[in-house]
Amino acid sequence: MEKKIEAYQAAVQKGILLNANEGYANLSDEIIQEIAQALPSIHFNRYPDNSQEALLEAYGKVMGISPDQLLAGNGSDQMLGLLIGTYLGKGKKLFTFDPDFSMYDYYASAYEAGVEKFDLKEDGRLDIDAFIAQGRKDKVDLVLFSNPNNPTGHCLSVDEIRKITEAFAPVPVVVDEAYMEFSDEVSALTLINEEKNLYVTRTLSKAYALAGVRVGFMVSSQENMKTMKASAVPYALNSVSMKIAEIVLGHADETKQRIEEIKARRNAFCEKVKDFRRIQMHNSQANFLYGKCADKEKLLEAFDAAGIVIRNYKGKDTFRITIGSEAECQAAYEVLKNFEEI
């Protein structure tokens, strides 16, 4: 019987783009010039360095992680796919949140695995004890969730992550930290050396403004990474992507400044919309805001009329808005404000 896998809906590319949680601005002219000067050193006729040595050293230096605990791939999506393919298959079960990142379902379906979901509370929070109880009852084979959560923006504490990881051991627990740079919580990376069933994925697509380059990482214990590296597709990253990533990772100050600007803009946006009645917006620890509106279709029409593209969750009364530039956020706020006052 032929499998039916629902296609992932890629982001729209026209208008004011506040739908894909990308960086709102391109890299600085200084970094772009450095990249241009580095291109002639690349041997385009040769396969890329499969050891990923320079890239893993650069990322490890920034994150304070040993390179032998790292693996890079074509976006963190590929790392998630590798983990799901390793631990799941026909008759196996993935356990995740609802709502959460839709690619988890996509990969699980591709490997003919089942997906068990646990509903988050109305405010995006998790009932951890109930989550653990359901997962144990269902005898799941892999636990996977984003933190901060995509789309709610809520972030679990490192102690909550530890509780989940220890409760499910030896079942693998994967924490997708695509948006962790925007959070004030402590990363699950601090648990890597003590929780042997824990994996963390990271990306350069969000905080590092490299969505167009597609570089992501998997992090775990040295023992786990030996197994994962043996299973990984060879030459997963091209030479150009690796070189660009290495250069950007060398400009930590610029990345930090960008992150702080986005966090400040996000917090200001949250403050302005917190008392709205027609629209309910969640506080967020990511680079986006999650909202709910009973009359969402009319709200979407208002955004469309303003030339602003936001993320619409079909079949639900929810939506998500990326924190863009100051002008983009103001334009999005004006749509919400005008809708609120109708």
Protein language model annotation of sequence segments:
Residues N26-S28, N197-D275, Q280-M281:
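PLP-dependent aminotransferase class I/II
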Residues E53-K93, A327:
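Phosphate-binding glycine-rich loop
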Residues M1-R46, K61, K139:
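N-terminal "arm"/small-domain region of PLP-dependent enzymes with the aminotransferase-like
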Residues T86-D141, F145:
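PLP-dependent aminotransferase-like
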Residues E122-E177, E181-S183:
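Active-site phosphate-binding strand-loop segment of PLP-dependent enzymes
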Residues D159, A302-A306, R311-I342:
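PLP-dependent enzyme catalytic core of the Aspartate aminotransferase-like
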Residues K263, V273-A306, I323:
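Conserved PLP-binding catalytic core of the aspartate aminotransferase-like
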